[in-house]
């Protein structure tokens, strides 16, 4: 039996006492486990139930699936998005309906993992949803996502919104999480100081390194990027590093046209990255997405393992990296992305 942290326990109690609401927890505070424990509780009954988990990206939907299935063992899994997965996947509304109806016929539970882009397919299927969890719920206020969000807020038996960065609106013409009819009230809120005081997250330390001035950022070569990252790794004691690149092209140039990979290996670091163009790569070998995340989780849990993961915005998309202790920025970020891209080595 998992021992929840005090703030997680408060949140699960609030979810049992409310059928709709917002759960606001800082990055690294364990929002996913709160939802998982609620799902486990909902699946304890003999009556078949359907739970939907919504993520902003396919990568996160796949990682959430892996996290949920460590604890949810009595539900059939369906993915509704265009990504690859070992589970049954479809974006056709009639197939979604058929899948759920077949499971209900044999009185079995269903858990659906989808994205905001594909949520309307679940809506079109017309299935009855017991509970829906909106992960990184600030994404739901986007105009093209708000319709399905509003629908499930009114049609699902239970509806909960998880985020660290709540987005509100001051005009009736723009969706915002202060719309109580859609999002409900804030039923659980956790502050970052509480998590720091409890030792659950570590306050970030900022190191500023000065390099030579480049008048035109577009002329910064991949060799310069390599030099900047490697010198930072040499100057600061780091084990598990995220390098935030500007674009996939910058990442590909760094790996293909410099000795960055060899420099990492010479220092005892493994490396991995994943993009839509290159696919998933671990230490120079192409792997599938499931192998990528399995490797990322395994390395993250090993306190002695040193690795570098390169991505554009993996943390700001809600994807977690266990025991990440450092982030090197090669790009600018907006405030929300910057808040999400903070290491939480005690997670």
Predicted segments, located by residue:
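Conserved helicase ATPase core of P-loop NTP-dependent helicases/translocases
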Residues: 278-311
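Conserved strand-helix element at the start of the C-terminal RecA-like helicase core
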Residues: 52-53, 57-60, 233-258
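Conserved interdomain linker/interface between the two RecA-like ATPase lobes of SF2 helicase motors
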Residues: 186-245
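Conserved small/polar residues in nucleotide/adenosyl-binding loops
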Residues: 340-347
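Conserved helix-turn-beta segment of the N-terminal RecA-like "Helicase ATP-binding" lobe
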Residues: 61-88
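Walker A/P-loop
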Residues: 19-37
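Post-DEXD/H (motif II) to motif III coupling segment of the RecA-like Helicase ATP-binding lobe
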Residues: 142-198
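A short beta-strand element within the Helicase C-terminal
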Residues: 320-332
């Amino acid at each position: 039996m998992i021992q929840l942290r005090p703030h997680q326990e408060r949140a699960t109690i609030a979810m049992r006492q409310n059928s709709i609401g917002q759960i606001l927890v800082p990055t690294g505070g364990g929002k996913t486990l709160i939802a998982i424990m609620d799902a486990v509780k909902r699946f304890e009954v003999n009556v078949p139930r359907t739970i939907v988990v919504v993520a902003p990206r396919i990568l996160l939907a796949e990682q959430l699936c892996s996290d949920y299935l460590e604890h949810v063992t009595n539900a059939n899994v369906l993915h509704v998005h265009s990504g690859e997965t070992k589970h049954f996947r479809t974006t056709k509304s009639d197939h979604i309906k058929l899948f759920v109806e077949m499971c209900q016929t044999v009185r079995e539970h269903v858990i659906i993992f989808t994205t905001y882009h594909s949520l309307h397919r679940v809506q079109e299927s017309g299935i009855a949803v017991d509970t829906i969890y909106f992960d990184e719920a600030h994404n739901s206020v986007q105009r093209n996502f708000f319709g399905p969000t509003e629908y499930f807020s009114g049609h699902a038996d239970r509806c909960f919104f998880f985020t660290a960065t709540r987005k509100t609106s001051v005009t009736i013409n723009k969706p915002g999480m202060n719309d109580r009819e859609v999002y409900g009230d804030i039923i659980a809120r956790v502050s970052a100081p509480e998590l720091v005081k409890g030792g659950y997250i570590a306050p970030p330390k900022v190191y500023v390194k000065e390099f030579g001035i480049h008048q035109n950022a577009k002329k910064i070569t991949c060799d310069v990027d390599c030099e900047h990252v490697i010198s930072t790794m040499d100057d600061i004691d780091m084990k598990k590093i995220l390098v935030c690149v500007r674009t996939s092209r910058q990442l590909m140039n760094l790996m293909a046209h410099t000795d960055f990979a060899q420099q990492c290996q010479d220092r005892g670091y493994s490396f991995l990255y994943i993009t839509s163009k290159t696919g998933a790569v671990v230490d120079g070998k192409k792997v599938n997405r499931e192998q990528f995340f399995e490797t990322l989780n395994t390395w993250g849990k090993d306190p002695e393992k040193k690795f570098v993961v390169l991505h554009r915005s993996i943390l700001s998309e809600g994807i977690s990296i266990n025991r990440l202790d450092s982030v090197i920025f090669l790009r600018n970020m907006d405030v929300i992305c910057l808040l999400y891209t903070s290491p939480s080595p005690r997670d």
